[in-house]
């Protein structure tokens, strides 16, 4: 009995055209085809690289300054990537010097802004490099449309989600938005997450935050993410809360177009 040189075609392999998830991989005997195995190894390597890639804030700072947006680069209490990965608690707080810098910035620019925006590398600086500038443009446009005041953008090296609480508190902001690189998956090394907190302050838990996840070309488009964010911000200001008490009940918009913004259809969504 001879072993087929090529794997038999799976009847549902066509679903791979609709999702980047690792489905319908096929088989050769009792094993994966060589191509699928190599693709897995590549995806795993890309995820590892995304975690360890150093955050390069210079292009983002240049883009912000070109737009006339004030910004400041700070460091969390984690001194380097190794400590950041070993001590998650240090990534949630600013270094003492950074906190002092932010107090000085607040003294110059004043406080009580409606929205503060933090950009942190998180577990994927690649996601920040690829998507943060575009999302900041969307947030600026949304704030201008709604009449919300914006604090200077705060960039944080070795930051985790909760660092937004300290930043927002020091800036005396009504809300804080954290744009952060999400933990890479095997098909998503560049996924950007967005976290919203009303009346940020040190010590809040994840229950106080709303999350908009998987912002990238193959996931949630910039326009769709901004649509959801606009709804959540308006409701947060109206109801004076965020987190588990605030549900995303935004109506699904008509196609929010833009060549780079339209995410591919998936079989999970209705036509």
UniProtKB/Swiss-Prot annotation:
Adenosylcob(III)alamin binds at residues 161, 182, 211. It is found in: Bacterial microcompartment. One of its GO terms (molecular function) is cobalamin binding. It catalyses: ethanolamine = acetaldehyde + NH4(+). Its cofactor is adenosylcob(III)alamin. Its EC number is 4.3.1.7. It holds the Pfam family EutC. Its main location: other. Keywords: Bacterial microcompartment, Cobalamin, Cobalt, Lyase. Binds between the large and small subunits. Pathway: Amine and polyamine degradation; ethanolamine degradation. One of its GO terms (cellular component) is ethanolamine ammonia-lyase complex. One of its GO terms (biological process) is amino acid metabolic process. Belongs to the EutC family. PANTHER family: ETHANOLAMINE AMMONIA-LYASE LIGHT CHAIN (PTHR39330), ETHANOLAMINE AMMONIA-LYASE SMALL SUBUNIT (PTHR39330:SF1). Catalyzes the deamination of various vicinal amino-alcohols to oxo compounds. Allows this organism to utilize ethanolamine as the sole source of nitrogen and carbon in the presence of external vitamin B12. HAMAP family: EutC. The basic unit is a heterodimer which dimerizes to form tetramers. The heterotetramers trimerize; 6 large subunits form a core ring with 6 small subunits projecting outwards. This is Ethanolamine ammonia-lyase small subunit. It comes from Xanthomonas axonopodis pv. citri (strain 306).
